[in-house]
């Protein structure tokens, strides 16, 4: 009898999956949602797959996530490293419903490559899972990540490309093109949203450059290597980072190396992230008397909608300024 009831419950759950509310536009991570929701404003809904408080670096797909991918009219994802967990379900839907940012030709020359040699010296390390987000009991598959694949020259692409205003404008154009195909009756509104996005981003970028200009010589360390596009766009002087992969805390050799750099350079701040809280940052800050700040590369506190991408960049700028100005 129990077995019959169990099977009945499973059948009911499966039957209700297609009835779940779905967004016409689904972004893999929130920063992409900032871009898409700005262009889709008044046209269709936007949802973000990875929930607030979670990190895409260790996210496991749930059955409900797979259903969202299958039922969305448009899925926007990076296509590499950050959201590699989406590769399987996306391969099962119509490619016309997908924007794979890593495949956009105009973006390839703009990708930032960095050298990670001294962070791969056989150093001991430990996993730094310190964020607590809930998972459904059933997952489509386990973690499937390829953190910063390194080429023969020791260089790897930084896929946190949403921090590049230039790349984000290209993505916004691609989203506008897709939405225009899907909603030809909203062509004028989509064009207006795109124009508003570009204008607002330009205006906000000018303000951010002016805000951060006095801080351009202030050195700092970030928790993981996610901010190079932002730093390049707005002239900040990043001294280094604690780890390439935020799931792996730096080991003793790396910490010793960072401490030396803090002492040799004029480092003003060490930045942690809300998704991860490694003790090493607080420990180093106490021993070196360097300020601790917080950067959120996902923008959990920023609401989706018009101007949300510009607001996200401004929130990052404010976090930098708050710590580096001390």
Which residues does each PLM region occupy?
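Extracytoplasmic metal-acquisition and chelation regions
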Residues: 23-326
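Gram-negative bacterial Sec-dependent N-terminal signal peptides
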Residues: 1-22
């Amino acid at each position: 009898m129990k077995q019959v009831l169990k099977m009945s419950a499973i059948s009911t759950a499966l039957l209700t999956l297609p009835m779940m509310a779905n967004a016409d536009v689904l972004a893999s991570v929130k920063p992409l949602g900032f871009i898409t929701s700005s262009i889709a404003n008044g046209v269709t809904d936007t949802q973000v797959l990875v929930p607030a408080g979670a990190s895409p670096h260790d996210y496991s797909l749930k059955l409900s996530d797979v259903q969202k991918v299958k039922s969305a009219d448009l899925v926007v994802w990076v296509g590499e490293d950050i959201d590699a967990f989406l590769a399987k379900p996306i391969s099962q839907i119509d490619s016309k419903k997908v924007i794979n940012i890593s495949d956009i030709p105009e973006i390839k020359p703009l990708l930032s490559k960095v050298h990670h040699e001294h962070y791969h010296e056989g150093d001991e390390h430990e996993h730094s899972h310190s964020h607590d987000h809930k998972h459904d009991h059933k997952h489509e598959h386990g973690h499937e990540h390829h953190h910063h694949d390194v080429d023969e020259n020791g260089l790897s692409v930084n896929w946190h490309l949403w921090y590049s205003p230039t790349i984000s404008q290209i993505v916004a154009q691609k989203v506008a093109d897709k939405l225009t195909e899907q909603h030809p009756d909203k062509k004028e509104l989509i064009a207006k949203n795109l124009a508003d996005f570009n204008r607002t981003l330009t205006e906000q970028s000018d303000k951010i450059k002016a805000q951060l200009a006095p801080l351009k010589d202030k050195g700092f360390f970030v928790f993981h290597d996610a901010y190079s596009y932002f730093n390049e766009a707005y002239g900040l002087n990043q001294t280094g980072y604690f780890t390439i992969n935020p799931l792996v805390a730096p080991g003793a050799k790396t910490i010793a190396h960072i401490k030396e750099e803090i002492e040799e350079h004029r480092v003003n701040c060490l930045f942690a992230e809300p998704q991860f809280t490694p003790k090493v940052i607080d420990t180093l800050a106490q021993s070196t008397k360097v300020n601790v700040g917080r950067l959120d590369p996902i923008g959990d506190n920023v609401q989706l909608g018009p101007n949300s991408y510009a607001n996200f960049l401004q929130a990052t700028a404010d976090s930098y300024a708050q710590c580096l100005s001390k």
